[in-house]
Amino acid sequence: MSNRTYADNLFPQQVAEQHEEQMSSGSSPKSNSPSRSISSVEAANSRIHIGWMATTLDVAENLDRHVATFCTRLGEFKYNFVVYPIGGVVRAFWTPNGSAENHPPVIDLPDVQLRNDLWESYVVGKISPWIDCDSSDPAFASLSEEHLLKELSYICYLGLQTMAIELTRISSPRTAAILKKWIWTRNSRFTVWVQLPSAIEKCKDYDAFTIEHVDLWTIWADFRKNCGNFSGVYFQVALTISSELPDELTELKLVDRWKAEPLAAFVIESGLFISGRNGEASIPSAHINLLKHLWTTDALRIVLRATTDTFKYNTSIKSEYSQALRHAVRNVNYRSRPDVGEGSNDSTHYLNVIEYKDVLQAPLQPLSENLDSGVYNTFEQDQIKYDVYGEAVVGALKDLGADGRKTVVIYLLGGGRGPIGTKILKSEREYNNTFRQGQESLKVKLYIVEKNPNAIVTLKYMNVRTWKRRVTIIESDMRSLPGIAKDRGFEQPDIIVSELLGSFGDNELSPECLDGVTGFLKPTTISIPQKYTSYVKPIMSTHIHQTIKAQSIPYLSRAIPSHGRGEPELDEDEMWIQKYPQGHVRNNMDQIYVVYLSKYIPLAETTKPVFTFEHPNFMNSSNERSDSIEFVMDRNADLMGFAGYFDLQLYKTVMLSIEPSTHTPGMVSWFPAVIPLRDQLRVGEGDRISLKIDRKVDNTGVWYEWHVEKKKTNGESVSTPIQNPNGESYYMRM
């Protein structure tokens, strides 16, 4: 007697055995042998999930009581799941006729015909398509609301993990209001797929004469907003793809918007398939390109919806559909990954940046907080950055050494655990080998200034073990260096070297730190870096916006200091607590973050510069700044904020950059900064947006304040609130 379950029947036994054999043997998937090709196909069968949507064409007698058999047959055709009407097909495909006696059939989809775990894993419950809560007929709208609630309740009863609801209108405020209340107030966490029509012209309320600036994306974005912008983990969108692709699914800048949305699935209509060379079902190239472009992860789902009854008399067509769909996308996600295997020198190999995708990180504040060994260790993995620093030091030594001098005094300001110190001493050797052969060597006299007492332990060890006691180590805040140097009789520097930059350039207070040593410098002292500039670019990312807004503070972390001006204090119970008078959500949204951006798109082709600082600052120029940066929007979108970058001129033409167009190849020391808005701002094609940003300074710290002004094409202006006033949420202490 067989011990196989329904789940096992989704794939033939031999496939599972082949997969187990491959996994146990540990064989490489790179072989091009026929057996490996078969294995890759079977791996795609389990890795890429293709579902079948039950339609009127599937209706058979007592189908609602034979769901297990229906699913098992689909499994034989390589379908991993089914999208099935939650009330059953009899109820789902009922046709209202306007009669008062005409009532929809009751929900009649018995739960005991499948194990609970199979309902959860293999069935997506679809809301009956006749339900229209936004109908112009008040009675039918009310009836629809009543039965939508019944079907939502039954989804919870069955314990389904996912449900689908198909929008048939451009505007569905009443449907959104019902869903909004349900998802926000019920303790039920199923995922909602909001299925869009294949084209805006398919909407019941479409009117070519009155509809302007509306497309499929705006239908989704408005519905998402009307549902309270619920978490994209549980509230997602499904695109319907038919034979005719609308312009917004062929024009790249419009297609890209879906990369910034919680895209869950593609509903593929069978009518788009064509006959291939051998007569098998094939997908047109335009549709393949669309799927590949949006296939950012194998967690996406594809659903086949039959629009013709071909599958009833062509028994192989179902398999051909699923095979063609898997073939279209099976290698996309793998090909897009960088090769970081054996022999690769890609920096991402050892930093594992993939783990940081879309993870929010607070910018470091090394001036007010001492870094730990693990942070230093992470920095030190990026050899490319240190190599470029070495190149800059060699360039400066070449210029200074041209007069034949024997000694150059270098101060490393902020030594950390010493990697730049090591690079400076190697640069001395490189300079002498290149430019002083047959002459007296140039000697670097190196001082390292570091305020972190813990890192001083490492620096002293390095001085004995690696640097042969050549370095003078000064344990001090660099801003105290002029006084210390005067007391101890230290020489003035010919070169100062520092690495004090954050993801937005000056946001780790490099200007304030370096200004503190200006009085100790010679008029000819070279600073490495000489100049740095921050840049911004508007971005769209529903995921990042929701992630920032949803942050919460665990009870045991409630006294951890905020990133703002406020400090922890004792409450009435003598317990330490960090208070947020501005509110937790506003506190979250009024900060700058560091993020390895993935689920986002830029809304401008190029960045624009913001703040520039040059060193040494002999003119004692103020470090306060104010700027207005304007961008013209080229599509309808939701602006969530700005990505921030910087570049720095280390010495003359030697540069480091994370600005996208000039990014230093292979360097991963800095991820982009994100400057969020409190709420996503809807922008239209042709709108002008201006980021107004100030860098403010007082006696104890530095902060940014920012807001956006939007000018629409009709001249109407909108301004967002000023964020982070007086540094209440994000304050960089000096």
Curated annotation (Swiss-Prot):
Amino acid composition bias (Polar residues), ranges on this chain: 1-16
Effect of F379M: Significantly elevates methylase activity, and converts PRMT5 to an enzyme catalyzing both symmetric and asymmetric arginine dimethylation
GO biological process, alphabetically ordered: intrinsic apoptotic signaling pathway in response to DNA damage; locomotory behavior; methylation; negative regulation of DNA damage response, signal transduction by p53 class mediator; negative regulation of DNA-templated transcription; regulation of DNA-templated transcription; response to odorant
InterPro entries found in the cross-reference section: Arg_MeTrfase (IPR025799), Arg_MeTrfase_PRMT5 (IPR007857), PRMT5 (IPR035075), PRMT5_C (IPR035248), PRMT5_TIM (IPR035247), SAM-dependent_MTases_sf (IPR029063)
Name of the protein in its database record: Protein arginine N-methyltransferase 5
EC number, as in UniProt: 2.1.1.320
Annotated site (Critical for specifying symmetric addition of methyl groups): F379
Compositional bias of kind Low complexity: 24-39
Organism expressing this protein natively: Caenorhabditis elegans
Effect of F379Y: Abolishes catalytic activity
Protein residues bound to S-adenosyl-L-methionine: Y376, K385, Y386, E450, D477, M478
Binding site for a protein: F379, E499, E508
The encoding gene: prmt-5
Renumbered residue ranges of the record's region Disordered: 1-39
Protein localization: Nucleus
Residue numbers annotated as active site: E499 (proton donor/acceptor), E508 (proton donor/acceptor)
Gene knockout outcome: Defective arginine methyltransferase activity with reduced symmetric dimethylation of targets. Increased sensitivity to heat and oxidative stress. Increased germ cell apoptosis following treatment with ionizing radiation (IR) or ethylnitrosourea and significantly enhanced IR-induced egl-1 levels. Double knockout with prmt-1 results in prolonged larval development, shorter body size, reduced brood size, decreased egg-laying and 30% of eggs fail to hatch. Double knockout also results in reduced asymmetric and symmetric arginine dimethylation of proteins.
Positions of disulphide bridges: none
Top-level taxon of the source organism: Eukaryota
Pfam assignment, any one: PRMT5
Catalytic activity reported: L-arginyl-[protein] + 2 S-adenosyl-L-methionine = N(omega),N(omega)'-dimethyl-L-arginyl-[protein] + 2 S-adenosyl-L-homocysteine + 2 H(+)
Family the UniProt entry places it in: Belongs to the class I-like SAM-binding methyltransferase superfamily. Protein arginine N-methyltransferase family.
